[in-house]
Amino acid sequence: MAEAKQVLDVTDIQKILPHRYPLLLLDRIIEFKRKERIVAIKNVTINEQFFQGHFPGYPIMPGVLIVEAIAQAGGALLLTEIPDQNEKLMVFAGIEKAKFRKPVVPGDQVRLEVDVIVWRNTAAKLMGKAFVGDKLACEATVSCQIVPRPAKPENS
């Protein structure tokens, strides 16, 4: 991937991340700076599965899924830098200082800005922020680990 601003669509994202519906939470990557920063977009619609129960009559995107979207953006950044990326997964190792400032609701477009704080071998700490327009909706520091991807069962 290039250093300059670059757009990756959901098809490109699926080549990097193993997540699929209903847990793929990135629609587009709009900025990518190798080993440093990524900016991704999540378009939130009323059709999201989680709105069925969170909350009926007042749909709000669960905060934990906003943090997951931050982690997925970070995963897209990190996994592109390692050899054999299709044989690896990025998993949570910790969440620190998660703060939720504004509800995310159907119709919102969430801009996920993720910066690398530290990255050593297979472990990283990332600072992520989720914005709706110019309003900060969520911020969190996430720690993650790159691990081998388990082999797929033969019948899958």
Curated annotation (Swiss-Prot):
InterPro entries, A to Z: FabA_FabZ (IPR013114), FabZ (IPR010084), HotDog_dom_sf (IPR029069)
GO annotation terms (biological process): fatty acid biosynthetic process; lipid A biosynthetic process
Main location: cytoplasm
EC number annotated for this UniProt entry: 4.2.1.59
CDD domains the UniProt entry points to: FabZ
Pfam families membership: FabA (PF07977)
GO molecular function: (3R)-hydroxyacyl-[acyl-carrier-protein] dehydratase activity
Family statement: Belongs to the thioester dehydratase family. FabZ subfamily.
The protein, known as: 3-hydroxyacyl-[acyl-carrier-protein] dehydratase FabZ
Organism, as annotated: Koribacter versatilis (strain Ellin345)
Taxonomy of the source species: Bacteria, Pseudomonadati, Acidobacteriota, Terriglobia, Terriglobales
Gene expressing this chain: fabZ
